[in-house]
């Protein structure tokens, strides 16, 4: 009996020690972004007020950096990086819903004067959105998003190419639906049409590919990313990953291996608490959509927000009100009538560019121009803040998008 008890004690001690070691290992993987926290503290007075009680607004940034382990194969590390993907994730106060809003990287935006890595200040510019991350890092990106939306960003997470691949591999791949066969030698991507499961390398090529798929627009690329994330969320939920330590550990290890977080989300305990808070959120209430946009009048390789739809979306999120999604954006290229044209509130599909981005090479430098239309925003000294656009009367605003319960080929599960 003593032997059994002693053996049990040894197992418990060793097991606890192993668990503690693994916890500390994962916890130590996460890099803390103190620089961004310090910069946001410096400009605290210009930031929006926090949202309603218990809501969380998290900015997810996919960096295209070529530095770091596993990223050099995607190009030369020239010391700069841009936000390849940026998503504003709103978690409702009661966690009954989660809304992920993609912000186009080529969206024209008012980027404030930001602190560069060398300590100098940039000038305020009206340029494509992803220039904010290149010039002033996460702090500049957060400030740009807050000015655009009027939403206080509570936390931010940055992940690179390597981290994305590892997370996909950790769940044994993610199922996608490919409408037409893809053969893209540059992206090392060769996929047949139909449903299939993609592992890390091919999954990364699939969500990043642009000019070789469809009409070459960033809108289609974001739609693919949203469908992919919806499929990933659905797989994690349906496989019971969050409740199974043997499945959860590889995912946490992958997620933390290339993760940079603000001081409020830089521990495994904080991240786990955040994720577990969504355990009872229905997949039908996990929504993915894109900020309402259309081609920018002065350069159809760029986008601009559609008003008043964009402000109605941001107003709903600020007030923690429900946002509906229905269908996908019409991606057929059409000429732009005029910059001030806007459709029915919330439900109109943005106009696509008259010239496909595949036919015109994208600019490599930021385009600093004046906006053709203020589009529902107002000037407040040097800072541009979102006007208090009211929500449309009668029911929730609805936008093109998808939910995590949708089948990858378009039918609700």
Language-model segments: which ranges?
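Non-catalytic, solvent-exposed segments at the cell envelope interface
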Residues: 1-413
